[in-house]
Amino acid sequence: MSDWNPSLYLHFAAERSRPAVELLARVPLENIEYIADLGCGPGNSTALLDQRWPAARITGIDSSPAMIAEARSALPDCLFVEADIRNWQPEQALDLIFANASLQWLPDHYELFPHLVSLLSPLGVLAVQMPDNWLEPTHVLMREVAWEQNYPDRGREPLAGVHAYYDILSEAGCEVDIWRTTYYHQMPSHQAIIDWVTATGLRPWLQDLTESEQQHFLTRYHQMLEEQYPLQENGQILLAFPRLFIVARRTE
């Protein structure tokens, strides 16, 4: 599991794209020229940007070769670059930096967010959506299984929090719109929950395990999910998925 799996990621494409659509709807920009899609993945968020601003120059950034290859195949008219978000430098100031479900993987948000604001043009916008599910059973159980089986903690850090992000971006010279939404995804089985998180949140936990260790981990994880997520009357499971949204507009 050394690289991301675009096919597995896109298995829940509609659910993963919905937050991007809702984030994009709150971006207060009309005619713009330069856009960066940070953590573009297979290009599903980039396609939304291209639909809204077809004349803009859009660059998708991702560290995964597999994701970049998939995005290039899907959107040949857009530019895609394999790079680390923290080190990538645009050739010109950006009117919009769009980051849908990517920045949560990176550390040091107190430094990262002001850095991203510095890449914006005057009145440019930083639009961010991050899963805020560190305390949800899906992610708590990952840590518990790893502890039970004596594996090191490889999960991401929790988000800084609403008040912290507001202060970080206000001090960086932005007007800030911030909100949190909890989605309730209808899942047909506990295995479907595993399929969902295997493409994202479970990757760090599984990537260095042998095949037998992965199976042992997932078997125990499945058992614990059954205890935490009861079936609805119709047999479905409601998977709560909180997400944090930020639209920060540079005032300088």
From Swiss-Prot:
Coiled coil: none annotated. GO terms for biological process: methylation. Pfam families: Methyltransf_25 (PF13649). It comes from the Bacteria. Disulfide bonds: none annotated. Its main location: cytoplasm. InterPro entries: Methyltransf_25, SAM-dependent_MTases_sf, Trans-aconitate_MeTrfase, Trans_acon_MeTrfase_C. GO terms for molecular function: trans-aconitate 2-methyltransferase activity. It is found in: Cytoplasm. GO terms for cellular component: cytoplasm. Keywords: Cytoplasm, Methyltransferase, S-adenosyl-L-methionine, Transferase. Gene3D superfamilies: S-adenosyl-L-methionine-dependent methyltransferases, Vaccinia Virus protein VP39. The keyword Iron does not apply. Its EC number is 2.1.1.144. CDD domains: AdoMet_MTases. Belongs to the methyltransferase superfamily. Tam family. NCBIfam families: PRK01683.1. HAMAP family: Tran_acon_Me_trans. Catalyzes the S-adenosylmethionine monomethyl esterification of trans-aconitate. This is Trans-aconitate 2-methyltransferase. The gene is tam.
